[in-house]
Amino acid sequence: YAHTAFVVIAGLLSLQGCSKPAAAAPATAETALGAEHISAASAVDAGRYLVKIGGCNDCHTPGFAMTNGASPAEGEWLTGDSVGFSGPWGVSYPANLRLSFQNMDEAQFIELSRAGQGRPPMPWPSLKAMSDKDLKAIYAYIKSLGAKGEMAPAALSPGVAPDRPHIPFI
């Protein structure tokens, strides 16, 4: 009898693994925009990491994408670029983030990141999905670099031909 009971219990336990798993709790705005964040020794370190993995340098640092990240040195990061991106929106140029945010406080930076109203190819959905803590870290990192470089060229309206190199999207 003990052997039969053991077999029945073992069988029931093995069937437990075949049952449908419980549904995961749905994500909430708090989870999507508040709880997830990068941890590092400091906000500046977290911001540096997010800038690196987020691809910010690919557009906002001259020569970075062309050298597969080998150059320029970190002291030259995020100074914008005069190589534009063209498409139905016209031509947009990657902003010099080090100058753009010098007169912007942290709250304004977060508001801008959440609004996401700039031209393509800026990945606004990625910024909107970041937690406030991560956006604050990016802001701290950019501010830590200090002002450097020149402002990016002004965006061009659709139909206006650029007088400098650009990457056509369409």
Regions found by a protein language model. Name each.
Residues 106-114, 132, 136-139:
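An amphipathic alpha-helix signature
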Residues 84-107:
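Mid-chain, structured segments of secreted extracytoplasmic proteins
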Residues 58:
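Short, cysteine/histidine-rich loop/knuckle motifs that typically chelate Zn2+
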Residues 48-54:
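Local sequence-structure signature of Cys/Sec-based thiol-disulfide redox active-site neighborhoods
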Residues 98-102, 111-113, 124-127, 144:
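A structural feature that tracks compact, well-ordered secondary-structure segments
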Residues 14-17:
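C-terminal motif of bacterial Sec signal peptides marking the signal peptidase cleavage site
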Residues 22-40, 53, 61-92, 120-170:
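Flexible coil segments in periplasmic/lumen-exposed cytochrome c-class electron-transfer proteins
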Residues 1-5:
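Bacterial N-terminal signal peptides that target proteins for export
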